[in-house]
């Protein structure tokens, strides 16, 4: 059975038969309902904030990183020192104005394709098929997409169905960053089930990408899933390494980043190494395509940010942004990861303050005014409470936990989930 009502049936069944048992076994991890939802909030709100911190600098810094450690949402009217290259011709340079006008967070491809995936999984189930997701893309995803996503969507109009839309022979952008930034939600669906999260993230990546162009998506898929229970960022990166096929430039690069992290105290030295070797990667007769939005250099700077950020939200997102390239994507992905690791409650005062002070003339009393405004996806309602989105992601996760050997219990009067984890 795999229809929308499946989630409600599973959850209701578990609630009506909650049991009391002793501690979980070695392969099981226990998380309370409250902690799970706090981490889901950190995941979604973290991605939003990371996106907005990185957005003003998207694609502006390539040869060198940004000369400051970005710690705020910059705007096009910035006139401080040092001089910074900020996008000034579109919404990327006017985020507070956009947020104030719309009354909350607004959609961008760092979250809105995941939002479509949420709708798709609610409609078809966790075992959604490629023909079904292709139809969801054709219905909801038509504008505000670029490179591999744009090419895949064009191919759908020509009659191709995923994963043919991501194959090298069909999609000339198969190596670009697109799948990393649109598939993190699979990790939230599978907390602590890193293999399932990575498998489904890869499934999603193949809609647009192929070969090593899917490898960063796999790594982050496993890492974000693991972050529900693992707080050591080095261990998270090791989990990402193990999830990725042991061939290709990203597999080589992620090991290099770990090595450089052990050699250099300053992340800027590691960024120099990444740019030198992986921006225009060559090995033997093989030359990787060169692009400011390639999954290779971008994916590696995200790993760098996770290591040097040491679990601190603002430090991690600051490094991910300041590293340059297509930096809003790394900022959003790593923000979602650290948001899971620490939960919204552990995101830190500076980060939470930013989510409530984006408007120009007022202050919200909840992150992003508890409002997600859809300005980019067709046939999805305009405004959705962020708290509702978080609850809906959590409902899918509960279903995944129960369908994969986990269970729901009541301990000391509180609901907990016992996850059949592979950590």
Residue ranges and their predicted role:
Residues 45, 102-210, 214-217, 229:
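Active-site cavity-forming subdomains of large catalytic enzyme subunits
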Residues 8-18:
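Bacterial N-terminal signal peptides
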Residues 21-26:
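Boundary at the C-terminal end of the N-terminal hydrophobic targeting segment
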Residues 1-9:
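Bacterial N-terminal signal peptides that target proteins for export
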Residues 49, 53, 60-76, 209-212, ...:
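Catalytic phosphate/nucleotide-handling subdomain of diverse soluble enzymes
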Residues 28-31, 155-174, 183-194, 202-208, ...:
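Accessory "access/gating" subregions that flank catalytic or transport cores
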Residues 55-98, 111-113, 134, 144-146:
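Active-site-surrounding "flap" and adjacent substrate/cofactor-binding loops of secreted or lumenal enzymes
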Residues 251-254, 258-288, 344-423:
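Acidic, carboxylate-rich catalytic segments that either coordinate divalent cations
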